[in-house]
Amino acid sequence: FTEEKAVVNADGVMVKRTRRVTSFDPATYRGRINIALDGLKKKYPTKQIVLLTPIHRGPASFGDDNVQPTEDFQNACGEYLDAYIESIKEASSIWSVPVIDTYSLSGIFPMHKEQEIYVPGGTDWLHPNEKGHHRLASCLYWQLLTLPCTF
């Protein structure tokens, strides 16, 4: 959000108050989420829209010029992964759409060697393997069952 001063009718009296304004800045992650959800809400007003958070990020190396650090490092923008997760949750509240928090609910935590059962291992602790996808799918299945499919 940004804030601006605006004149509004409050109980029959025109008063100046601070107003929150949703960001639609395409140069920001939050702005792009808001642009997308604004368009989806307009184009599909009767459909259930669901947001998902990413899962935890383990390390990955796919060559000298494609090395992905773990989530405990900031990205090139200076943000940690949890800042993006909070932005997704904020958008969920702004746009009245549910969010399935796979970051918390999936149980996949590739930061520990013992979690190798859910990732390819070796140089790729970022992507789920077949067991990881099954666990993620099960999480999504049970969460989606709690949501209305018709309105």
Residue ranges and their predicted role:
Residues F1-F151:
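Alpha-helical cap/lid subdomain in secreted, periplasmic
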